[in-house]
Every structure is written in structure tokens, then in C-alpha cells.
């Protein structure tokens, strides 16, 4: 390798500095890969290349890592800092067959034998000039821009045309101390290291570029030849009394309507546009958990991303983040309503495939769509779909639509060998541009059809949107899930492949709810969501600034000391910092008087801010319920509070997709924190500390509307034990409207008919809606809910229920 200060290398680095833009994956190798700067470090690369090492040098200089040009000197032994598994490829002929890397490995291992305290980190580094996966029928382009083993001439073309899309990827370090201690230091171990490294680089390339792209027409021809689709075409011809040719043409039309037409060129252009867009819109995008998903890709999993759906931005944000995290953007299931010009063709070339809102018993369309989805899985493309079916208008997760999850499950049952893993993804924003539109729709305005004019209108309103949040939740591998739900599923399918298992539909429902729960498990508590939570719990949506900051400090402490899950992310900084962030985003107003500053939510913004509160209300609903128990009862005991939480938790779990596994432990941890923070004391009973009672009262406000809903339901059930489910839903909704009108409740979800439907289903499942004469459980929960309400609200509910007619 030429010396770092040689004229040749200086010239090469000067050229690359002007032609090359390098993206590092992961963005923070120290944090994501746990690199230890106190230990010696060497790099392993697949191929020796001056341009690759020059690009690596630029990156290591910025990151504070050792330069690849500096030799590694340990215990008097000098070794190259970079070990390359194969030499440079000449312009003509084959590269030399010698293996100098084995000598390097042997020298490094031998030093570990001499010095037991030594532990060199061997860090694999992959470089990619562009990320085109190539096509199954590539010819000339592949020859000119061959990426796997380019000659120096081809590498020049790659730098010239693809230099702005250079990726340098660091992988987890290998401990040479571990290798020496566990496997020895002979030549056999050096060979093993080389084999493992080659496999790693091969897998890493597939993760970064994805599988080869098919010719679209060839894909259609392949799908139409499949046995299941041929059968569906024949059945369509018989049922519609048309020829098989006409039926086949219909199937082709469906395929053309559905199928993506992925274009790497468009993705590269979109990357530049989206980089500009995110920099204009957001001050930062916070990501948590990407490294684990990258490892799943590396291990050969078929990945299906299942994000929550807040905004049309979701389609762009997740794909962009995955691209920058060294993974291939997924094929996205998009609603057919988005297939309008010019967005539809662009989305399609970006990987979107389109799905109708309803299949309406169309067996041919169903067969075509299922076969296309199976093909995506079979070829190794990652897939993304929104299990909610549409964007949430309230900020809460919607009840899942199970169609896509069922089709994914069926693909596994039909024989996919690789593990298929669902990855729940929480997407959050400090500002959702559609929020105002959502509330118009909730108030009765008809939803506008998507069009190019809406796109222009949205672009015109672009501004400072704060930060975005992408948190990857705990993955669910479907084969493992099936083993849990039906241990003998493989044998059952082998006996009768055509018979739909009786356990399949219940299993799909369990899976859908588990996905939603794990999305909420990965929630992001941000400045906007936390401040909205606190202000909306106050009487006038306003608090003294110092009190608000103190309340947010309590919330931050609660989330950090009693974490909801390990996948949840919490905003950095203290309460003072969070309040200022929200003010800077124009989400909250500040007024002053001689006694100090007051932070408030404008009256015309209060409904909109419930959207952001609802994103994280599940994180605080149990602590809020505990606070309500403490503030409404002068003397409380732990067992009483645990019992109350246990009674309400099944309903909270159903409507908020919560996944707390050990309620008594969680409740006791929260109570212990309250004691530590000086909010309560404990002797024989739990007592609120008077001077800090305002913090608990404010915290309890977050559960008040939920308790009011439960009080409505259980007062109705206790008063009319034989009430039918449909009757309970309609009368609960009617009484909620009355309560809202009398007591100024404006949160949209309070009047959501679907929410009362969800609760009634859960009530029936729990046995509260039954013909049993014993209604003691219903009356107990009614009394508990009533005891935690303000007297005026309780009086309204009881009086309305006991009246002859609700009006």
C-alpha cells in the first residue's frame, strides 16, 4: 500500500474529496457497535482497493478512529491496519492467487498467545459504490459497472457515476482474544476467520442492495404459470361465463394494477429530494433499534415491517430511514386511493404495490394478490404494510385489519423456508400536517379524495415540524409464533394441505393484537407529546411555567426509572428544555404577569393537541390511575390499588394495546417511585404529601376521561343487567355526548363509536355482558369508577342512567 503522504495518494484523496459523498452505516459506530477506543483495532475488508481505503480514511478521520494508513504496532509486532481478503483485480486476467491476509491473521493471533491481556478488535468494513441490486436479465450495464469484483478501470467509472452514493458500513467487532482463547492460534483458525469474513461480506451485500430485480413482464408470466393462479383463472371463466383468455386478461390487468416497478435510479433521486425535505421539515429524526433489524436481515430473515399509520409521510420516512441504515427500502402495500398521477407512478417505482380497500369476494383478485405477495416473500424482498388499514384520526392506534397479516401467515403455511419476521414500528412526529383535516373529518366533514392538488397544498404549508421518531419494536418470527399457538401445525398441514386449520383465524387475531401492542411498546415520549399530556390534564389547559417544568421532570423520571418497556424512547433533557422546545415549535402559548409566565394551549388548538397526547397516553395511564386512587382516598393501601388497577386493566389493554405483563410489580414500582420523589408517604397506609399533591392531581387528570367512559358503561350495565351489546354501545355513545356537552369534554376519542364497540366486545369476553344473575363484579367496578370521578361528573352520569330515557 502506498504511504499516506505519497503524491499518488494525495492526488487520489483530492479527487475523491470532490467526487465522493460517503454515508456511514451505522451513523454512530461507537454507540451502535460498542467499539472500545482503549483497545487496539484493525479493519477487515473484502478486496484491496486504493479508492476504498481512501474513502475509509476520510470516514475514520471524522469518527476519531485509527487511520487505515497507520500500521498496527503491538508488542513490537508491526501489522497492516487493514487486512484485505483478496488483492486488486488487474485490468486483464485474474488476480494473484496468494493469500497474504492469512499471514496477517497469524501474526495478530500469535501476539495474543504471547500477551494474555491483549484483545485486538477486528472490525469488518464494507464499501459500496451505489446500491443497485442488478436485474435478473442484466447485460451491458452489469459489465460496465460490475460491483463485486471491479477492475481499476471499472472502479473509475463507479466513482465517477456513483461516487455521491458511497456507503461505508462498519460491523460488530470480532474479539481476537476470544478467538485465540476458544479456538487457538494456528493456521486453521486463520482460515476459519477468512471463511467467516467472506460469508459475512456476502450477506452484508445482500442486506445493503437486496435481491436481483425481476423484469416486470417476466414476473407476470411467471405468476400466471403458477398452479393456484391458473386454477383461479379457470374458476373465474366458469363463474363469469367468459373464455379463459378473457379471464387471463383480467388477471393481467389486476397484476398491472397491483405490482410495484422498483427503480434504483428513482430511489437515488428520491434520496436526494428526501434529504432536502427532511432537513427543511425536521430538526432531527430519532431512531432506535435499527441495529437489531439489520442483524435479522443479515441472518436471512424475510422482514415484514408493520408500522403505525399517522400520516402520508409514513410511506417516505420509514423507507428513507431504512436506506440510510444500510437496508433496502421495502415493497410497500399502499391503498389504491394513492394511485393517482403523478404520485402513483412515482410510488410504484419507489417500491409501492397497490391494494384495494376491499376485495368484495373477488376470488380472482384475491388469488392474484396472494400470489404476488408470495412471490415477494419467495424472492427475498422486504415488505411493509399498515395493519390499521388507514391513518389514525385521534392519535391512538386503530383496531387492526387482519387481511394482510392473514395473507402473510398463509404464505408461511404454504412453505416459506426462511424465517418470516414481523417488525412492529412506531412512527411519531412533533407535527402531523394532516391533524387539522383529521378533526374536520371527525366532526362530520367528508374525507377529500387524494389528488395532485392536495400534494401541492401540503408542500405549500411546509415549515418547522420539529423532530421525527422511528422506533423498531420487538420482532415476531411467525414460525416461532405458530409453534406457540399450534405446536403441531407442520404435521397438520402435511396431512391435509387444502384444509384451513380451525386455529388459524384465532391465531391471526392474536398476532394482529400482539403487533399493535408491540408498536405501542416502542412509543417515543417527546417534548410535544409530554407537554400536551400535562397541559391537557389541567383545568384550563394552562399551567405556571415552573409547575409545568416540574411536572415534566416527574414524567421523565417515571419513564426512565420505571420504564414501560426497553423499546420505549424518552426525550433527552429536563422539563425546562422540553417546554422550550414546544414553545419554539409554536405548539404552546406563553403569557406573563407579575407573578411569572403561564404556558397554555390556545382554545382553538386544544382538540388538535389531544392527537399528540394520545400517541403516548398508554405510557401514563396506569401511573395516572394510581395517582387518581391516591388523591381520591385519604388512606390507601397497596393491595387496594393493585386490585383496582387489575379490574380496569383488561379494558385499558383492549383499547390502548398495552402489554404490561406483571401488574402488581409495575404498580409497586410506581408507588415506590412516588415515595422516593416525596409525593406520598407510607406507614400502615399510603398518604399524599400535601405540598406535592398538585403533581399527583395533575397526573391523575390523564385518566379522567377514560374513567368517565368506564363509569358510563358500568352504570348502564348495573342499572340494566340484561342490556344487549348493541344497545350498550349506542346508549354509552349517547350518554358520552351528553356528558361532553355538560362538562366541556372535547377529546374526539371520547365520542368515538368504534371505541365503545371495542369495549363492548371485551366486556362480553370478560363475562360482564352475560345472562348471569350475579352482577356483583359489575357493581364493584361501577363503584370503583364512580369513586374516582369529580362529584359533578358522577352526578350527571348517575342521574342520566337512572332517568327513564337517556336524551
UniProtKB/Swiss-Prot annotation:
Position of sequence motif HXXXXD motif: 308-313
Family annotation (CDD domains): LPLAT_DHAPAT-like (cd07993)
Pathway of action: Phospholipid metabolism; CDP-diacylglycerol biosynthesis; CDP-diacylglycerol from sn-glycerol 3-phosphate: step 1/3
Enzyme class of the recorded protein, top EC level: transferase
Name of the protein: Glycerol-3-phosphate acyltransferase
GO molecular function: glycerol-3-phosphate O-acyltransferase activity
Organism from which the protein derives: Shewanella sp. (strain W3-18-1)
Matches recorded under SMART domains: PlsC
Catalytic function, reaction form: sn-glycerol 3-phosphate + an acyl-CoA = a 1-acyl-sn-glycero-3-phosphate + CoA
Amino acid at each position: 500500500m502506498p504511504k499516506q503522504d505519497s503524491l499518488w495518494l494525495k492526488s487520489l484523496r483530492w479527487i475523491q474529496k470532490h467526487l465522493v459523498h460517503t454515508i456511514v452505516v451505522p451513523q454512530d459506530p461507537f454507540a451502535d457497535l460498542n467499539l472500545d477506543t482503549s483497545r487496539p483495532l484493525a479493519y477487515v475488508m473484502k478486496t484491496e482497493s486504493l479508492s476504498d481505503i481512501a474513502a475509509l480514511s476520510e470516514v475514520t478521520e471524522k469518527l476519531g478512529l485509527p487511520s487505515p494508513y497507520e500500521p498496527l504496532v503491538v508488542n513490537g509486532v508491526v501489522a497492516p491496519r487493514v487486512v484485505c481478503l483478496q488483492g486488486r483485480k488487474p485490468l486483464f486476467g485474474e488476480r494473484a492467487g496468494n493469500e497474504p491476509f492469512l499471514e496477517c491473521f497469524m501474526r495478530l493471533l500469535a501476539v495474543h498467545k504471547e500477551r494474555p491481556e491483549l484483545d485486538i478488535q477486528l472490525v469488518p468494513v464494507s464499501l459500496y459504490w451505489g446500491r443497485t441490486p442488478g436485474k435478473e436479465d442484466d447485460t451491458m450495464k452489469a459489465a460496465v459497472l460490475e460491483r463485486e469484483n471491479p477492475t481499476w478501470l471499472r472502479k473509475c467509472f463507479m466513482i465517477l457515476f456513483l461516487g455521491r452514493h458511497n456507503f461505508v458500513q462498519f460491523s460488530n467487532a470480532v474479539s481476537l482474544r476470544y478467538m485465540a482463547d476458544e479456538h487457538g492460534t494456528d493456521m486453521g483458525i486463520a482460515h476459519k476467520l477468512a471463511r467467516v469474513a467472506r460469508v459475512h461480506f456476502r450477506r452484508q451485500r445482500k442486506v445493503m442492495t437486496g435481491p436481483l430485480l425481476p423484469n416486470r413482464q417476466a414476473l407476470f408470466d411467471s405468476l400466471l404459470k403458477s398452479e393456484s393462479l391458473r386454477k383461479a383463472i379457470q374458476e373465474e371463466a366458469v363463474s363469469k361465463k367468459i373464455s379463459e383468455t378473457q379471464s387471463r386478461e383480467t388477471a393481467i390487468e389486476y397484476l398491472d394494477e397491483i405490482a410495484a416497478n422498483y427503480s434504483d435510479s428513482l430511489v437515488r433521486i428520491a434520496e436526494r429530494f428526501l434529504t432536502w425535505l427532511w432537513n427543511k421539515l425536521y430538526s432531527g429524526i430519532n431512531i432506535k433499534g435499527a441495529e437489531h433489524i439489520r442483524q435479522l436481515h443479515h441472518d436471512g430473515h424475510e422482514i415484514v415491517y408493520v408500522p403505525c399509520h399517522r400520516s402520508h409521510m409514513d410511506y417516505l420516512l420509514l423507507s428513507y430511514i431504512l436506506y440510510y441504515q444500510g437496508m433496502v427500502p421495502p415493497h410497500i402495500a399502499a391503498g389504491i386511493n394513492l394511485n393517482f398521477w403523478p404520485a402513483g407512478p412515482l410510488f410504484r417505482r419507489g417500491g409501492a404495490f397497490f391494494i384495494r380497500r376491499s376485495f368484495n369476494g373477488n376470488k380472482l383478485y384475491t388469488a392474484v394478490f396472494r400470489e404476488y405477495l408470495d412471490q415477494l416473500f419467495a424472492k427475498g424482498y422486504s415488505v411493509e404494510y399498515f395493519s390499521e388499514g388507514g391513518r389514525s384520526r385521534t392519535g391512538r392506534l386503530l383496531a387492526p385489519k387482519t387481511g394482510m397479516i392473514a395473507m402473510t401467515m398463509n404464505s408461511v403455511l404454504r412453505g416459506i423456508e426462511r424465517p418470516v419476521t414481523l417488525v412492529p414500528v412506531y412512527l411519531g412526529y412533533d407535527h402531523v400536517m394532516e391533524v387539522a383535516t383529521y378533526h374536520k373529518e371527525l366532526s362530520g366533514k367528508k374525507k377529500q379524495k387524494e389528488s395532485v392538488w392536495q400534494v401541492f397544498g401540503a408542500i405549500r404549508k411546509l415549515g418547522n415540524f420539529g423532530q421525527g421518531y422511528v422506533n423498531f419494536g420487538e420482532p415476531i418470527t411467525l414460525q416461532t409464533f405458530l409453534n406457540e399457538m399450534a405446536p403441531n401445525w407442520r404435521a397438520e398441514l402435511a396431512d391435509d394441505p387444502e384444509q384451513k386449520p380451525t386455529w388459524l383465524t384465532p391465531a391471526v387475531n392474536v398476532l394482529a393484537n400482539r403487533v399493535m401492542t408491540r408498536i405501542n411498546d416502542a412509543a417515543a415520549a417527546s417534548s410535544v407529546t409530554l407537554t400536551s399530556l400535562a397541559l391537557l390534564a389541567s383545568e384550563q389547559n394552562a399551567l405556571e411555567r415552573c409547575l409545568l417544568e416540574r411536572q415534566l421532570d416527574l414524567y421523565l423520571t417515571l419513564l426512565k426509572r420505571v420504564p414501560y418497556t426497553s423499546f420505549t424512547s424518552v426525550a433527552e433533557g429536563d422539563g425546562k428544555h422540553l417546554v422550550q422546545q414546544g414553545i419554539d415549535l409554536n405548539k404552546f402559548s406563553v403569557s406573563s404577569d407579575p407573578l411569572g409566565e403561564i404556558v397554555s394551549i390556545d382554545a382553538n388548538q386544544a382538540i388538535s393537541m389531544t392527537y399528540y397526547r394520545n400517541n403516548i397516553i398508554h405510557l401514563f395511564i396506569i401511573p395516572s390511575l394510581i395517582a387518581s386512587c391516591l388523591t381520591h382516598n385519604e388512606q390507601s393501601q397497596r393491595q387496594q390499588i393493585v386490585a383496582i388497577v387489575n379490574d380496569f386493566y383488561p379494558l385499558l389493554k383492549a383499547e390502548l394495546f398495552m402489554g404490561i405483563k406483571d401488574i402488581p410489580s409495575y404498580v409497586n414500582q410506581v408507588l415506590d417511585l412516588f415515595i422516593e420523589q416525596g409525593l406520598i408517604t407510607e406507614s400502615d397506609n399510603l398518604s399524599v404529601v400535601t405540598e406535592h399533591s398538585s403533581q399527583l392531581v395533575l397526573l391523575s387528570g390523564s385518566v379522567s376521561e377514560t374513567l368517565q367512559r368506564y363509569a358510563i358503561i358500568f352504570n348502564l350495565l348495573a342499572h340494566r343487567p340484561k342490556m344487549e351489546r348493541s344497545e350498550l354501545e349506542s346508549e354509552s355513545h349517547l350518554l358520552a355526548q351528553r356528558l361532553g356537552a355538560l362538562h366541556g369534554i372535547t377529546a374526539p376519542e371520547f365520542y368515538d363509536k368504534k371505541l365503545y364497540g371495542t369495549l363492548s366486545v371485551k366486556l362480553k369476553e370478560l363475562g360482564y355482558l352475560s345472562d348471569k344473575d350475579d352482577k356483583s363484579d359489575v357493581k364493584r367496578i361501577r363503584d370503583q369508577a364512580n369513586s374516582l370521578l369529580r362529584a359533578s361528573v358522577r352526578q350527571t352520569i348517575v342521574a342520566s342512567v337512572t332517568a327513564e330515557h337517556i336524551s
